[in-house]
């Protein structure tokens, strides 16, 4: 994954699936999942001495964030599999987090990614973003992201 200096990347253990009772996009190559969830602290890092650093995304962190023409990639690398501008990617904020719905039927490579997701070979998500405002609680070792400046991409990932 090419790391960009101004961006942060987070993977989420929430599932990315090819099954859904209610589709946001009508296509046979439909996938959905969550790029992030709100108000649920997760382990960000553990030091050798056992000190654990946690992070949580505030429920209002994405309010007003730049989410113009976000793309969907695999492992945050180069190839675009879906994007907002051609309506093959929908990002939806709900009570749980940032929901992602995508149509992976427009290209052979996108259909290949769909097949990997459907087979359970790829089943997690990640996202790339920049932070505008944050807070750190030294007592609980928890970083709270209060405001996201921009969302760059959401990605299906092999290893979260």
Identify the function of each model-found stretch.
Residues 1-160:
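Signature of dsDNA virion morphogenesis modules
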């Amino acid at each position: 994954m090419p790391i960009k200096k101004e961006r942060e990347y987070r993977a989420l253990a929430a599932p990315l699936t090819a099954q859904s009772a209610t589709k946001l996009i009508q296509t046979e190559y439909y996938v959905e999942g969550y790029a992030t969830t709100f108000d649920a602290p997760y382990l960000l890092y553990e030091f050798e001495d056992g000190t654990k650093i946690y992070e949580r995304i505030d429920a209002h962190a994405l309010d007003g964030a730049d989410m113009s023409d976000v793309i969907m990639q695999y492992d945050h690398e180069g190839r675009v599999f879906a994007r907002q501008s051609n309506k093959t990617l929908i990002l939806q904020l709900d009570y749980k987090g940032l929901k992602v719905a995508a149509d992976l039927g427009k290209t052979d490579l996108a259909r290949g990614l769909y097949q990997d997701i459907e087979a359970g070979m790829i089943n997690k998500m990640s996202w790339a973003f920049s932070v505008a405002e944050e807070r750190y609680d030294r007592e609980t070792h928890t970083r709270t992201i209060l405001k996201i400046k921009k969302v760059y991409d959401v990605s299906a990932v092999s290893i979260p």
